[in-house]
Amino acid sequence: MKFKLNRTEKFLIRYYKPMFFSYFIILVLASLFFGFMGWSTIGRIFNTILLIFMFYVIFVPMSKAKQIQQLNDVDFDILSMIDACNQMIDAYNPKDITHLSSFCLFRIIGLINLGDFDRAEQEIKFFWQHFNLKKIHPSDIAQTHSLMANIALEKDDIKLFEDEMRIVYEYGNKPAIVGTFKHSYNYNVKGMELLSEAYFANRNNCAQDYEHRVFEHMNTNPLTGKPLKKKPKPMYYLMACSKLFMFYKNTDNNQKATYYAQQLLSIGNEQLNDYRKAKEYLENADRSN
């Protein structure tokens, strides 16, 4: 999962140094001009307005943009990721639904990876109750139901799991989600993961279908069939490996369970709940042999 920067944020990150330098030159020239003309009071008012404008229009948005950029660089240090999300949620304007909902989703994913399912469930319910869901993108809402389904599966609540996955399936067929494929390779993977989980829940050749859809779309644009110019971060691969490991482990397919457990160990770390399960599984398999 990656947070998107809008055009203004990208522009500020790229050009904030020359912009600050330009504003400094304007301040100096304005001070000299108003001083030369004997309009010192007007000069002070002008410079004050310019400084306020620079602070609120450039400095504050640029700082937030750089924080988002840093958050995108977080890999698998889950505790640091959750801490960063907490800081961003505290710092953001409550009306900025787009960014706030993304930070909340990222925090929920972190909690699930840590194995803190009760708190993750509380976070999802908070998300549903306190956000105006009409203003949130359908793919993000579908993601919350997908995550709740994961929690239900961990707690062996099969009815809740199937109910949540039906909702995911309904969202997965909405044009609003399919349409995002045109804009971001991250949404390609995210959207296909949601659809794959729906098939996974409906048990239509579930594991094979899931493998094909997720891993093929890690490298291919589903609209054009061409390879992606940018590769998605390993988190998607890790999440997919986690689900497939648990599926094959529970269906006694030891060969594939071992393969995906090894994949988890190669890309995860001790913080991850599924990493610990995979490690325990491989250790038990070694003792059995």
Walk through the language-model features, giving the residues of each:
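Hydrophobic alpha-helical transmembrane segments
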Residues: 36-51
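Helix-turn-helix repeat elements of alpha-solenoid scaffolds
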Residues: 42-44, 70-87, 112-126, 157-173, ...
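N-terminal topogenic membrane-targeting module
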Residues: 53-133
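Residue-level signature for tetratricopeptide repeat
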Residues: 70, 110, 151, 196-200, ...
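Flexible helix-coil transition and linker loops at the boundaries of alpha-helical arrays
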Residues: 86-97, 129-141, 172-184, 219-232
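The tetratricopeptide repeat
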Residues: 103, 144, 179-193, 233, ...
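Structural register within alpha-helical repeat arrays
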Residues: 107, 148, 190-193, 197, ...
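Long, non-transmembrane cytosolic or organellar matrix-exposed soluble domains/tails
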Residues: 202-289
